[in-house]
Amino acid sequence: MFSLQDLCRKNLFLPLEPLGKHVVQRLGLYWKGHGSLKQMGQCFVCIDQTWILSIHKALQIAASEGNEDIVKLLILWNGNLKYAIIGALEGRHYDLIQKYYNQIGDCHEILPLIQDPKIYERCHELNVTCTFQCLFQHAIKDNMLPILQKYGQDLNGNRRMVQLLYEMACRLQNYDIIKWIGFNLQVYNLEAIFSIAFVRKDLTLYSLGYMLLLNRMSTEDRNFISIITRHLEYASKKGLLDFVLESLKYGGQVDTVLFQAVKYNHRKILAHFIHHVPREIVEKLILHAVESRASRKTFNLLLSSINYCMNPFVKKLLHAVVKHKFMLIIKLLLERPKKKINLVNAALFKLVKYSTYPEIVKYMKEFSVNPEMVIKMAARLMRVDLIKKISKDAWENKLERIKHLKQMVHTMNHRNGKNLIMYNIYDITGYTYLNAKEAFNLTRFYAVHNATCLFKEMCKNCFVHDLIQLRELLEDCLHIANRHAYIQIAETANEYIKYIDDITPK
């Protein structure tokens, strides 16, 4: 319950002059040594009609003087109890502290309001269960460096504590305290600052880390070079250009940055450096981009830096494209509005040589490659499996398949490749009924292309058809063989002609 006097004091906003000094004193509105007190709104008081202070500041002063009546008045005017405790600590008025501290309950709530390190420590001591570690941690939170400086020697003997405080200061981005700890205490893991700087993306903290590192080691130190390299890799991986530039001030290789930037498609970093590096490096980066399956924009940036001049390293590029099964760069070179670079066939040849059937089919669909081209390449490279699978997929009808394969033989120069396709044709006919015309045409085809063994086999198969027509075919084949000097074909044709003559009734 408020007394009548308290109610008057709490709600009195009128000028005090008409009341007279005696009434002001009786109302408890007179502050000894300062003058009359008048409430000014919710946050300020006027002292002796001239001096305006915040209620909290006035409360702190009154408590430091031990003036319990004025403290009570200012609390009545919504003054914060925490400032009363601070003032009481300044004047060492423990009776006031005892009276009001229980209403707050936790000294840690007061600490952020204190500027004086001595009062700060005194306030912390109000909680008798707190340790020095608690004091140091709050000192870091509240930027109370003098507390740490006071106990610096004691801290140096506790490596675990120093490391804990150092990392805490880094997380709170308290640069002054970080600097003091780094230069004055034995921090066993200084590098923790960099991990925190990366997480917070705090370049100031990152730079401070290098300042502390260089206080311990030189830029020529092997460990320092290793640290720089790790930082460059991580910063470029995350696309942090400012961090990359900061690290490069102290050493490291731009190549390290570029390879990571390509791998993770950080074009901002690439664009910053790419036009200042030698062509050989750009070529390696393009190969790395293929391996990393980089984006279209990354490839365009790299290619534009060498003006799309691919000749010096086409072989290496094709090898990388086939090895990693990533064809985007082939497509980009083909899509150029001017001066298209067509590597489709060159890449296809490598694929046919080294890749599986599904991979080749995927490539054929992507670049609209006709099956004849693939089959010819497969024949030259002796890939029987591809000839069979691709021809079967392209032409389900066997006669249609034979027709296309025969056309390929006509247009091929590679002898072994032609033979392979012809054997494949014969293999198809083994499971297909051929009428006389089809069988005779195929026999003549083998004669024209000097496929002796296949010619013999087809001659045997043709004996089921009309022998007169067969003899005419063999004479035609003999004429072809003599014209081209196909000795074995001629001998075979001649042999079968004689045989037909022997078995035919006169």
Swiss-Prot record:
Keywords: ANK repeat, Early protein, Repeat. ANK repeats lie at residues 54-83, 253-283, 313-343. Gene3D superfamilies: Ankyrin repeat-containing domain (1.25.40.20). It comes from the Viruses. Induction: Expressed in the early phase of the viral replicative cycle. The keyword Repeat applies. InterPro entries: Ankyrin_rpt-contain_sf (IPR036770), MGF_505 (IPR004858). It holds the Pfam family DUF249. Plays a role in virus cell tropism, and may be required for efficient virus replication in macrophages. Belongs to the asfivirus MGF 505 family. This is Protein MGF 505-9R.
